[in-house]
Amino acid sequence: MNPLEMQRKGPPRRWCLQVYPTAPKRQRPSRTGHDDDGGFVEKKRGKCGEKQERSDCYCVCVERSRHGRLHFVMC
């Protein structure tokens, strides 16, 4: 890529995505539907079929729309 193209388009973009657990290891549910403190953990399937759990901790979901935009969703 020559310098004129880099001025027009900018440098190539690099994406880095790190995945963190939804809760620390000691807070993960030992039984299905419940966490260690007796609270309920909601389970659902993501778009690609992956399991997502919702507990007292926050996780960030990154979704790409059909228009190529990235959406950050706090769940």
Curated annotation (Swiss-Prot):
<keyword id="KW-0814">Transposable element</keyword>
<dbReference type="GO" id="GO:0005634">
    <property type="term" value="C:nucleus"/>
</dbReference>
<feature type="region of interest" description="Disordered">
    <location>
        <begin position="24"/>
        <end position="43"/>
    </location>
</feature>
<protein>
    <recommendedName>
        <fullName>Endogenous retrovirus group K member 7 Np9 protein</fullName>
    </recommendedName>
</protein>
<feature type="compositionally biased region" description="Basic and acidic residues">
    <location>
        <begin position="32"/>
        <end position="43"/>
    </location>
</feature>
<keyword id="KW-0539">Nucleus</keyword>
<keyword id="KW-0895">ERV</keyword>
<comment type="function">
    <text>May possess a function in tumorigenesis.</text>
</comment>
